[in-house]
Amino acid sequence: MVSRFEHPAGGYKKIFETAEELNEPLPATVTGRIPSFIKGSLLRLGPGLFEAGAEPFYHLFDGQALMHKFDFSNGQVTYFRKFVKTDAYVRAITEKRVVITEFGTCAYPDPCKNIFSRFFSYFKGVEVTDNCLVNVYPIGEDFYAVTETNYITKVNVDTLETLKKVDMCNYVNINGVTAHPHIERDGTVYNIGNCMGKGASLAYNIVRIPPTQKDKSDPIEKSKVVVQFPSAERFKPSYVHSFGMTENYFVFVETPVKINLLKFLSAWSIRGSNYMDCFESDEEKGTWIHIARKHPGEYIDYKFRTSAMGLFHHINCYEDSGFIVFDLCAWKGFEFVYNYLWLANLRANWEEVKRNAMIAPQPEVRRYVIPLDPFREEQGKNLISLPYTTATATMRADGTIWLEPEVLFSGPRQAFEFPQINYRMVNGKNYTYAYGLGLNHFVPDRICKLNVRTKETWVWQEPDSYPSEPLFVQTPDGVDEDDGILMTIVVSPGAQRPTYCLILNAKDLSEIARAEVEILTPVTFHGMYKP
């Protein structure tokens, strides 16, 4: 799964450039044969505006949200894109400057205001961004573009028009929700975010949003908290990007990357600052793993711990013979990986990109196993008896259960990230295959498949081509777990038609078809296939 290619020409820089939205869809040139069951839309989100007037955005997660869509109908394909008209975007375009502080870019008061107006503008409270550039997913019959704050944005996925801004704080005790919910077959949505818990301490709430209502009312209005996880530190919640869910349990990994709440609140009231300034990490704090029963929502007060790591994406999580098995795209050590995702780093020449990545945390795919009955064995003995994994769990004298992982994949500066599975068939179940985007020193340059049982890998890769997260679509009559296709948007800057939707056979990553358009697209993070 290690990349075969170097990138001295620096074509990857093109995926970090501003794009214009389209007034109408562009027809795509199709090579190969689009599978007959693909009759829907591939929806993707990512940054598309990397400066406001003369003011640049500095971090990968600052660019304003651009929504992309490839439409498929009877073998014909079109491409369309529009900016999500968030408050952050509209005000940046209107005022030609950064108006709302983003992840790594600080907004300053309007220079046209007098000194007294500028002074008092610091004391109006925190203005949280609604820049929903990370993902899109359904809630009931509607679709929402999302980031990781309390705001989600309702969009029309047919026209890509922006419909409504929704503040989740109006419905549940939550400071923000992740862009990676779990969605059950009936449409029930589960998500996680930090909140103010008991005793004026920070905590983490699992939120449940019910499926489509019979009376067609908005399911968000019936959102509720189902269980709460405590925070290891009272005023420093961990950064949370995703969580695990089995049929009967929630799994939450609390990493040593913390948000300093006092620093966060003072950042806007005292001095110009951004979200990145409020993170801190400490290797000695290690990583805590929490579990809770799903029905009823009940926190299980076992003290599972492991060494410090960074974490963004869970791959899958399932129960087996009294154990919970969960697979992660981990990053070794305590340092925050986002420290290496400044646009200046990502746009650097190839040799500099490699030098920056060499000092960053090392990525690897890990499997951890949690014993649901950790007190059945004596102290110091391995509690894991599953025959197919080398992951261990041991009880320590202080009552904590120490977890050591099995490494499923590790390559030098070669990440398996943005993981996908056959979600409908195997989410929350024992499974075999994961699909991911391969990062070569943080440059996305291949699509990967991993057999988590045998550690066998497959790779799709072409020179000077930069794909996105692969989305799995199951064949309608598919029986095997990998009966289906992968869909990814690839940017090949030197080509006549530099962007294409690539369709791969999920069995062996062989190409089935591609739909090319004569336009460049910037990087995208996550998305979905809407049948």
From Swiss-Prot:
GO terms for biological process: retinal metabolic process; retinoid metabolic process; visual perception; zeaxanthin biosynthetic process. Coiled coil: none annotated. Binds 1 Fe(2+) ion per subunit. Its EC number is 3.1.1.64, 5.3.3.22. Its main location: cytoplasm. Fe cation binds at H180, H241, H313, H526. InterPro entries: Carotenoid_Oase (IPR004294). Signal peptide: none annotated. GO terms for molecular function: all-trans-retinyl-ester hydrolase, 11-cis retinol forming activity; all-trans-retinyl-palmitate hydrolase, 11-cis retinol forming activity; beta-carotene 15,15'-dioxygenase activity; metal ion binding; retinol isomerase activity. Palmitoylated. Its cofactor is Fe(2+). Keywords: Cell membrane, Cytoplasm, Hydrolase, Iron, Isomerase, Lipoprotein, Membrane, Metal-binding, Palmitate, Sensory transduction, Vision. It catalyses: an all-trans-retinyl ester + H2O = 11-cis-retinol + a fatty acid + H(+); lutein = (3R,3'S)-zeaxanthin; all-trans-retinyl hexadecanoate + H2O = 11-cis-retinol + hexadecanoate + H(+). Plays important roles in the production of 11-cis retinal and in visual pigment regeneration. Capable of catalyzing the isomerization of lutein to meso-zeaxanthin an eye-specific carotenoid. Belongs to the carotenoid oxygenase family. This is Retinoid isomerohydrolase. The gene is rpe65a.
